[in-house]
Curated annotation (Swiss-Prot):
One of its GO terms (cellular component) is cytosol. This is DNA-binding protein PTO0204. The lineage of its organism: Archaea, Methanobacteriati, Thermoplasmatota, Thermoplasmata, Thermoplasmatales. Pfam families: dsDNA_bind (PF01984). Belongs to the PDCD5 family. NCBIfam families: PRK04239.1. GO terms for molecular function: DNA binding. Gene3D superfamilies: PDCD5-like. Keywords: DNA-binding.
Amino acid sequence: MDRDDELDEIRRRKMAEYQNMMQERAYEEEQKKAAAEEEARRQQILRQILSPEARERLSRLKLVRPDLVENVENQLIQLAGMGRINKVISDNELKSILLRLTENRHETRIERR
């Protein structure tokens, strides 16, 4: 009987591990789905408020400055949500926004002697 009890205990542990693993997978899939839905919502808003050229500029800039682009996108989405953007933002307008945001940036330079 000891042997059967040990086998039952091993089976119970394995079943609990399997159930935990399945719950974790379901949670991860749910999180991925929610993130994808949020990104789709953001892109829809950006399509409404940015010209195609401005969207293209942001997508190129995202390759080198993802933090800046995320900040700009968040601000634009927030302004659109408050109704403060009344027209489509052109590429030139986006350039001026980006210039204003980056001109305050301080660069640290290290000189080797």
